[in-house]
Curated annotation (Swiss-Prot):
This is Outer membrane lipoprotein omp19. The gene is omp19. Residues 28-79 are annotated as: Disordered. SUPFAM superfamilies: beta-Barrel protease inhibitors. Elicits an immune response in humans, mice, sheep and goats infected with B.melitensis or B.abortus, but not in B.abortus-infected cattle. Disulfide bonds: none annotated. A lipid is attached at residue 21 (S-diacylglycerol cysteine). A lipid is attached at residue 21 (N-palmitoyl cysteine).
Amino acid sequence: MGISKASLLSLAAAGIVLAGCQSSRLGNLDNVSPPPPPAPVNAVPAGTVQKGNLDSPTQFPNAPSTDMSAQSGTQVASLPPASAPDLTPGAVAGVWNASLGGQSCKIATPQTKYGQGYRAGPLRCPGELANLASWAVNGKQLVLYDANGGTVASLYSSGQGRFDGQTTGGQAVTLSR
């Protein structure tokens, strides 16, 4: 009757565990004293408050204009970013990783003429991007359209290989390579 390898391994493991319980490293935990209390902190001396006159307001520049009549009705989010570059169809063509509402998908943007500009192919895209049929470049703006020619989303380049914008429903959408 021989001893199997599993039995021998179990016996060795039990011996190691029991030997660990006999260690003197854990035996003196009852004799450990707490650290000494920290030294007291001295109070900060209180100074006196001095009184002085403020400078005349006429020596400061004028406040910016608050005339809102020229800007009424303008949606700031719809304005193009000042740093956005002008786009070309060649810069947009290709396959993009799209992100909408925390979900992601892929969008193919070949330079095949279709509808408002060029054909677009969404692959398992969520929400409004599922209706995507075409795309077009309009100056600094990339516009995505549905099959009826309605705008699905408007985006601007926010860096090399990245577009950020909103769907017509107001959801943030990002395209990246």
